[in-house]
Design a protein with these regions (language model features):
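Catalytic phosphate/metal-binding cores of nucleic-acid and nucleotide-processing enzymes, i.e., regions
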Residues: 1-106
């Protein structure tokens, strides 16, 4: 599978998860490859989807955070490369309440 198709499949997969979990019509930004923009927009969030065969280090970080947090707490990883800005990583299922709370009331 070429990388463009793999990326589009990942975007569709994330849209479907968000649609099911939030009950909100979430769609891919189809002009993003032409315009260089975000992949998905929902409320104030602009989402960039990355799908790779392996995300070895990031998954190791999350596994460590999950072990430390235990079942009663939310694991969050904050990381950065030297000279770069800090990044926050959490599981999509844990982020759903935050996204849901940010949606406009219908």
């Amino acid at each position: 599978m070429n990388s463009r198709r793999k990326g589009a499949n990942g975007e569709r997969e994330v849209c479907e998860i968000l649609n099911q979990e939030l009950g909100w019509a979430v769609k891919r930004n189809l002009s993003q490859s032409r315009d260089g923009g975000f992949d998905i927009e929902i409320a104030q969030f602009r989402i960039e989807v990355k799908r790779r065969k392996k995300l070895m280090v990031q998954h190791e970080f999350m596994a460590q955070a999950e072990k430390s947090a235990g079942p009663q707490h939310l694991p969050i990883v904050i990381m950065r490369a030297d000279g770069e800005e800090w990044l926050l990583m959490m599981k999509l299922s844990d982020a759903m309440p935050l996204i849901r709370d940010a949606l406009p009331q219908r």
